[in-house]
Amino acid sequence: MSIKAEEISSLIKQQLEHYDDKLDIEEVGVVTYVGDGIARAHGLNNVLSSELLQFDNGAYGIAQNLESNDVGIIILGKFDDIREGDRVKRTGRIMEVPVGDALIGRVVNPLGQPVDGLGEIKTDKTRPIESKAPGVMQRQSVNQPLQTGIKAIDALVPIGRGQRELVIGDRKTGKTSLAIDTILNQKGQDVICIYVSIGQKESTVRAQVETLKKLGAMDYTIVVEAGPSEPAPMLYIAPYSGIAMGEEFMYAGKDVLVVFDDLSKQAVAYRELSLLLRRPPGREAYPGDVFYLHSRLLERSAKLSKELGGGSLTALPVIQTEAGDISAYIPTNVISITDGQIFLQSDMFFSGTRPAIDAGASVSRVGGAAQIPAMKKVAGTLRTDLASYRELESFAQFGSDLDQATQAKLARGRRTVEVLKQPLHKPVAVEKQVVLLYALTHGFMDAVSVDDIARFEQELYTDFDANHADLLAEIKSTGKLPDENKLQEALQQFASSFSSSNK
């Protein structure tokens, strides 16, 4: 069979019509050094800062140091099978993590991969871990309270939705417990919680996840876990991954609480990476941009304007101090970035005052505006009363001849300290806190012995739940104190029955 020349030419024309002249150009570098979670690569001349890079073995890295002859890369995940001479290519993207409702109730690593053994996370939404914080005009003032359920915080250092409140203290002073209790209290408050664990022991994180599950808090919580055995880059990116997951909900108009436990370990991981990348060390061997490390993270916490949906992201960063030294480099940095701090003191903790919140050193710079009017009224003088009690207490040790007024102040102070104590994982609803503090400030506890204050508190809640639920409901719905005559009458009835049963 002979093929005609015109048929050949028409076939060639057809082929040429459908020919797609597309070239895939990849910029590829060669690994010249690898170790301790970092790599150096030669040949990536056009790579951008913070660009995501991919190694031959499928592992990813982030370009950190752009130098004249090579690029310093931090490796995300295992680096055992990356060798000198391996290829590394540009992706043209920046690091992103999966986000959305599918992550709620799950435990993930900083890359958003599940580590809880409950199967893959089905979501097609992602967000970059680094994003610009909302500007001044995209925000509004903090105006809604975030109830922690911890009496000492809600009364003395109130937190608002969209605020950044630092939790600071030595090791073993109850910082993590305080954060977990705050998450537990968000049940039924329509707040999504994200707990970012940085460098915490895996057994500790497991125990916390079990606590959250047992008390029904995993229904609205995501846990991001970077254990101490993970390479330093994972600890470094963990907070950014956590806040990116939170931003997805914030920009959807929801309220989010993100706990970073703790940022001291992230700073140490960043110091390690910076020294390995041969960046010049500064104070305490931290690099010069360690302030920016935390400021660019915490500035992403905001209460968005109504035009953007009015969502909020509240940040609770945790910082560990050494021997109560809050004037060290990282603590002072984070104190200056945040809107207040809750200082936990080891002396108070070991003497049995738990939560061990030092009312004198703790402050909330914006939360007062978000406090409900009823709480503002009953807790108004509490801080000054506590401060004067501490002062009087130190003077009272030197002499026993105290006048009546001073003795009354000391007695009220002892009861105040006792009222602010709280057992672990037992958050108190704000309306009950208001009633309790009203009873304290109006003298209904003056006749109760200090040892009986805890029992007085529990029986007061039981009595109000049974006989005065309307008063509690009114405080909850309006945020204001109910008719004071009714409230005083109810408290008088209870106080008289309590004291008579004690005689």
From Swiss-Prot:
Residues annotated for ATP binding in this entry: 169-176
Record keyword Transport present: yes
Protein name as annotated: ATP synthase subunit alpha
Function: Produces ATP from ADP in the presence of a proton gradient across the membrane. The alpha chain is a regulatory subunit.
Summary of subunit composition and partner proteins: F-type ATPases have 2 components, CF(1) - the catalytic core - and CF(0) - the membrane proton channel. CF(1) has five subunits: alpha(3), beta(3), gamma(1), delta(1), epsilon(1). CF(0) has three main subunits: a(1), b(2) and c(9-12). The alpha and beta chains form an alternating ring which encloses part of the gamma chain. CF(1) is attached to CF(0) by a central stalk formed by the gamma and epsilon chains, while a peripheral stalk is formed by the delta and b chains.
Record localization: Cell membrane
EC number: 7.1.2.2
Annotated GO MF terms: ADP binding; ATP binding; proton-transporting ATP synthase activity, rotational mechanism
Gene that specifies this protein: atpA
Family membership: Belongs to the ATPase alpha/beta chains family.
GO (cellular component) term, any one: plasma membrane
Keyword list, A-Z: ATP synthesis, ATP-binding, Cell membrane, CF(1), Hydrogen ion transport, Ion transport, Membrane, Nucleotide-binding, Translocase, Transport
UniProt xrefs under InterPro entries: ATP_synth_asu-like_sf (IPR023366), ATP_synth_asu_C (IPR000793), ATP_synth_asu_C_sf (IPR038376), ATP_synth_F1_a_nt-bd_dom (IPR033732), ATP_synth_F1_asu (IPR005294), ATPase_a/bsu_AS (IPR020003), ATPase_F1/V1/A1_a/bsu_N (IPR004100), ATPase_F1/V1/A1_a/bsu_N_sf (IPR036121)
CDD domains: ATP-synt_F1_alpha_C, ATP-synt_F1_alpha_N, F1-ATPase_alpha_CD
Site (Required for activity): 362
Lipid bilayer topology: Peripheral membrane protein
Main location: membrane
Xref: SUPFAM superfamilies: C-terminal domain of alpha and beta subunits of F1 ATP synthase, N-terminal domain of alpha and beta subunits of F1 ATP synthase, P-loop containing nucleoside triphosphate hydrolases
Reactions the enzyme catalyzes: ATP + H2O + 4 H(+)(in) = ADP + phosphate + 5 H(+)(out)
HAMAP family the UniProt entry points to: ATP_synth_alpha_bact
